[in-house]
């Protein structure tokens, strides 16, 4: 064996489709044989096992408002090539790093709209949940944005609340 063959670590691709819930993401990692069980993944992703993701600005800005899962909406959908011999923290951190990289460019746009990243994540979750099909996302997004920007009293007090995100 060559030296590179001796130290080569096994990798695998893990694909997280858009719209996958945190529980669904955890199940994908379990099914891939990378994590022992769903609860282990979710406890890490939510920080309830002591895992610290404070290196990410977004993590520190997620409100502690009693939501069921802090991680919901932040586990970035992507195809990841990961080492098969890592711990759960590595997998979650990889996804949070991708989320931070992909959303960094949106910070100014989100701030200009007078909202927070957390509200933007919840709105995106609403849109995906309501649309059901990716082809309907634009129509549903326009509808939600029109309602949120409306002066109509029916929508003026609207708060972003979702079973998935709250």
Regions found by a protein language model. Give the residues of each.
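Low-complexity, Pro/Ser/Thr
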Residues: 164-165
């Amino acid at each position: 064996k060559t030296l590179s063959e001796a130290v080569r670590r096994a990798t695998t691709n893990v694909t997280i489709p858009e719209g996958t819930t945190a529980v669904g993401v955890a199940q994908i990692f379990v099914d891939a044989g990378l994590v022992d069980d769903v609860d282990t993944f979710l406890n890490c992703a939510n920080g309830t096992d002591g895992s610290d993701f404070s290196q990410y600005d977004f993590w520190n800005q997620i409100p502690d408002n009693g939501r069921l899962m802090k991680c919901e909406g932040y586990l970035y959908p992507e195809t990841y090539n990961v080492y098969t011999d890592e711990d759960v923290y590595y997998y979650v951190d990889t996804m949070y790093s991708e989320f931070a990289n992909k959303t960094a460019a949106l910070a100014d746009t989100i701030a200009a709209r007078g909202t927070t990243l957390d509200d933007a994540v919840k709105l995106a979750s609403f849109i995906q949940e309501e649309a059901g099909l990716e082809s309907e996302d634009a129509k549903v997004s326009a509808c939600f944005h029109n309602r949120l920007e409306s002066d109509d009293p029916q929508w003026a007090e609207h708060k972003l609340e979702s079973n998935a995100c709250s």
